[in-house]
Amino acid sequence: RFVSTLAQLNPDINYVGIEKYSSVLLRAVEKQDELNLPNLRFIRMDAEAITEVFDRGEVDRIYLNFSDPWPKDRHAKRRLTSRQFFERYNIILKKDGQVEFKTDNRPLFDFSVEEVKEAGWQLRAVTYDLHNDAKLCEGNVMTEYEERFSAAGNPICKLIAVR
């Protein structure tokens, strides 16, 4: 729903949703068909191959919403906010591109803040309670997970990273 809402609000901007799992992707494609959004496409793929799909400097912004936390330390490089992934994002993002990340998982968020720095990126904005941060919450498009976790009383963390 997140990317569908963005596509509806910004018909002159193209969006590409990437999803690893077919079951999740199927629901998104059905929603896209229902809403008739010509500026929205989906790709089923593992994000590790992102540089094989997008050209250097092709992408304006990357949204990472409630990603799998891969809680075991040995799986840290699989996290979409690891420095290994920021190396990939560095290739496909335009010079002034940015990465926006939201989660309710505080350990993952703390890891991500450190990885942004270790990757040589800068934090443009950081909040540990998005819905009580008037500046960062302005224009926030909520995901289904965000609604669920927020309703359960979990604060939502958000960062915006730039090169």
Put a short name on every predicted segment:
Residues Y21:
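Conserved SAM/SAH-binding beta-strand->alpha-helix loop
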Residues R1-D12:
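Conserved SAM-binding loop of SAM-dependent methyltransferases across substrates and taxa
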Residues V16:
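Conserved beta-strand positions in the Rossmann-like core of class I SAM-dependent methyltransferases
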Residues A28-R61:
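S-adenosyl-L-methionine
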Residues V53, V59-L80:
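A short SAM/SAH-binding and catalytic strip from SAM-dependent methyltransferases
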